[in-house]
Amino acid sequence: MTGLKRKVLIGTITRNRPIMLQNLLKSYTNLIVPDNIDVSFLITENNNEKTLHNVIAEFQRYNITSEVIYTNEPALGIASARNHVLNYAIDHKYDILTFADDDEQVEPDWLLELLKERDSKNLDIVGSPVRFAAPLDKLHWWKNIIWRGVNQVNQGAEKRARTLYDQGKASKLKLATGSWMANLDFFRLTGLRFDTSLGQAGGEDWQLWQDAKEVGAQTGWTPYAIAYETIPLSRLKLSYYYRRTRDHARMVYHERLKKGKAGRTFGSVLSRIYKVLTSTLLLPLQKERGLITIAANLGGLVGFIEGAFGKKSAHYINIDGN
């Protein structure tokens, strides 16, 4: 603590997305910061060397009252980069850490609303919605179908999360780091970190949430702290959502295997088969959303089977966006 002020570190990890990063940092300049908070920004580039000096310098010019720290993490992998930020926050005696992804932008009250939810319920970890930003350019008809489908799926997920929140059951929601806040005393006490053994498979945020719940973390979610994700055109393909879910399923299988729970995969496979069949039958009604559901569940089905045969995921070797 600094006097009566809490120290908050707004963490960002990034790799090969300078334009998207600029947009995120620009949105940070509009954040509403409570009077009892000291905010610093840490931008960690997941690269052997720093390549973003101009981007960081521009951001610093707009943040004359806040400290801006720029570091790099040479060990490739989202978990390694997130741990770099988490360790920095702990070592430098911050009280609160937040994450938003480098392909996002946040609303001005994003930090305020996360803090409000965390403080009102004394939460260790809290998340919030990441909505999809509307495309800036007119899309090809097929890409527009994919866009509408993924947006409908995302809106449905947020609606279900809001229902649980209204029922007082937000602790059941899996929390990703796209819009995320943590009480650092919890991490000091438990020593929990993101699982670097996942490499570039992804899924380290949900895995951390699961590990945190197992050691007693109080977790929650707020519908009021909004972030917006920009979807690159390269992701507006059914094949992308197939690969993404396939790679995630591979990761889940190997995590279950490590914990002696690989037997649960049989149920997961049956569930995906059921969802593919029902979504195919309901496609005339579900339309765009149904296409995404079919592609994703086919990917999950294949991923669990491939995982059982030893295949692992490296989903984030290739980076979408710029």
Feature map (PLM): residue ranges:
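Acidic donor-binding loop at a coil-to-helix junction in glycosyltransferase catalytic cores
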Residues: 177, 199-210
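Non-catalytic, C-terminal membrane-associated alpha-helical segments of glycosyltransferases
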Residues: 243-250, 261-322
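Conserved donor NDP-sugar-binding/catalytic core segment of glycosyltransferases
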Residues: 109-143
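Short beta-strand-to-loop acidic/aromatic patch adjacent to the donor-nucleotide binding site
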Residues: 93-105
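Short, well-formed alpha-helical segments that are part of the catalytic scaffolds
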Residues: 17-32
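Glycine-rich, basic loop-to-helix element that forms the pyrophosphate-binding segment
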Residues: 73-92
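A conserved acidic beta->alpha catalytic loop
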Residues: 42-56, 104
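Short, flexible, basic/aromatic active-site loop/helix in glycosyltransferases
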Residues: 146-172
